[in-house]
């Protein structure tokens, strides 16, 4: 396959964006909406809610910790077979879950098997997308990740309708069929060879190189800190509002407000990430700082107007930081190592995601309210912002019209003049 000097910034890349849109919807849209099965599982197996909640927790943990496996397979064989295999595993897990007779079966089928399938789909797809775009990378990421928000609106009522008409076993069969569309998403991931790709060295050599790369390690620490506080409103905002005397329906509706703002923020940030000159890390630091401040202000707001305004602002800024967070990594490690780099980041930052909600709940139990929970969550994001400013070129303003990836492109396009014939002759 011929090597391209730079990403095409379009062409088949838009089909990869389409694939990533549906893939993000079929992975995280399903995960976000899977709570509608929660009550059905509790009633069917007569198990406590705590044990049932482990189904989704295992699936998320396997998806995140298994990301390096998906990255390694994509580096070795390409993203297409990795994602298509992941789609088959996801559908098979949901299919087997429909025959479950105990929670252990659901742990193994949905948690382990479908979780493994999700691990093989999400990271390779976004990494492939990063290789197709350079100057429009942030916009492409923003458009692709809107699939999460849109599917969160659609899947929850859809799954409830399926439960009402086909019971939970029939609904899981149909979710299995829906998940098979991940195979089609994988088929759209056409391999792309770039001049920046490593000539030698497999996934192991790339991982070793990344673990010795200071900026990559600092970026991973920053995202882990951000991830620790990022999801707190989605987990505890409704409970916080109930403590303030809100009814359940308006409290839940506020999350829908955040989801709408999230969609707008992702697209707007994607456009700004490509339009504003300089490293994308600056924009990521801005959105992260604003999100941290908003979280810390939640305990101060008690009036409904203030809470609605804060939630709209949180949805926008938290959605805005997502596409630029994925766009910073190619600037740090290059597109040649993006598969392994993104897999490692996903694995490490999952530690923050797993610890954030339990820590927030612990602070609620100790203090009796969610004041400390939101303040500490905001502090984690502000700490992540502090780490981001240590990244290379963050304070470099000498060439405000060029982005780091543009400098790489210019270097690749530079033509060195060859000596003319007869040079040196008398």
From Swiss-Prot:
One of its GO terms (molecular function) is symporter activity. One of its GO terms (cellular component) is Golgi apparatus. Keywords: Cell membrane, Golgi apparatus, Membrane, Symport, Transmembrane, Transmembrane helix, Transport. Residues 1-10, 395-426 are cytoplasmic. The keyword NADP does not apply. The chain crosses the membrane at residues 11-31, 52-72, 83-103, 106-126, 139-159, 172-192, 221-241, 244-264, 283-303, 306-326, 338-358, 374-394. It is a multi-pass membrane protein. The keyword Cell membrane applies. Belongs to the major facilitator superfamily. Monocarboxylate porter (TC 2.A.1.13) family. Proton-linked monocarboxylate transporter. May catalyze the transport of monocarboxylates across the plasma membrane. This is Monocarboxylate transporter 13. It comes from Bos taurus (Bovine).
């Amino acid at each position: 396959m011929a090597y391209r000097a730079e990403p095409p910034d379009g062409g088949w890349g838009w089909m990869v964006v389409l694939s990533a849109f549906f893939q993000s919807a079929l992975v995280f849209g399903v995960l976000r909406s899977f709570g509608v099965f929660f009550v059905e599982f509790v009633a069917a197996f007569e198990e406590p809610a705590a044990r049932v909640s482990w189904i989704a927790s295992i699936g998320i943990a396997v998806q995140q910790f298994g990301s390096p496996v998906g990255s390694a397979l994509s580096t070795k064989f390409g993203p297409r077979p990795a994602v298509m295999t992941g789609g088959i595993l996801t559908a098979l897990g949901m299919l087997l879950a429909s025959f479950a007779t105990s929670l252990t079966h659901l742990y193994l089928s949905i948690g382990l098997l479908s979780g493994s399938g999700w691990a093989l789909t999400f990271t390779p797809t976004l990494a492939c997308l990063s290789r197709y775009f350079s100057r429009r990378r942030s916009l492409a990421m923003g458009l692709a990740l809107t699939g999460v928000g849109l599917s969160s609106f659609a899947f929850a009522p859809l799954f409830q309708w399926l439960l009402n008409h086909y019971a939970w076993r029939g609904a899981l069969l149909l979710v299995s069929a829906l998940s098979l569309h991940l195979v089609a998403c994988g088929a759209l991931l056409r391999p792309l060879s770039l001049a920046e790709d490593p000539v030698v060295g497999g996934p192991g050599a790339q991982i070793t190189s990344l673990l010795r790369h200071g900026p990559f390690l600092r970026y991973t620490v920053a995202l882990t800190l951000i991830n620790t506080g990022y999801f707190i409103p989605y987990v505890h905002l409704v409970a916080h509002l109930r403590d303030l005397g809100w009814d359940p329906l308006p409290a839940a509706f506020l999350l829908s407000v955040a989801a709408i703002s999230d969609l707008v923020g992702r697209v707007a940030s994607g456009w700004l990430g490509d339009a504003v000159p300089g490293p994308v890390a600056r924009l990521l630091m801005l959105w992260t700082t604003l999100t941290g401040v908003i979280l810390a202000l939640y305990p101060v707001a008690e009036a409904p107007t203030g809470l609605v305004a804060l939630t709209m602002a949180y949805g926008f800024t938290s959605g805005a930081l997502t596409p630029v967070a994925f766009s910073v990594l190619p600037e740090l490690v290059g597109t040649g190592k993006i598969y392994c780099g993104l897999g490692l980041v996903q694995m490490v930052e999952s530690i923050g995601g797993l610890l954030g909600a339990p820590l927030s709940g612990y602070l609620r139990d100790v203090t009796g309210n969610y004041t400390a929970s939101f303040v500490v969550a905001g502090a984690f994001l502000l700490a992540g912002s502090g780490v981001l400013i240590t990244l290379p070129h963050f304070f470099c303003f000498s060439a405000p019209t060029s982005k780091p990836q543009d400098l790489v492109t210019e270097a690749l396009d530079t033509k060195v003049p060859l000596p003319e014939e007869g040079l040196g002759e008398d």
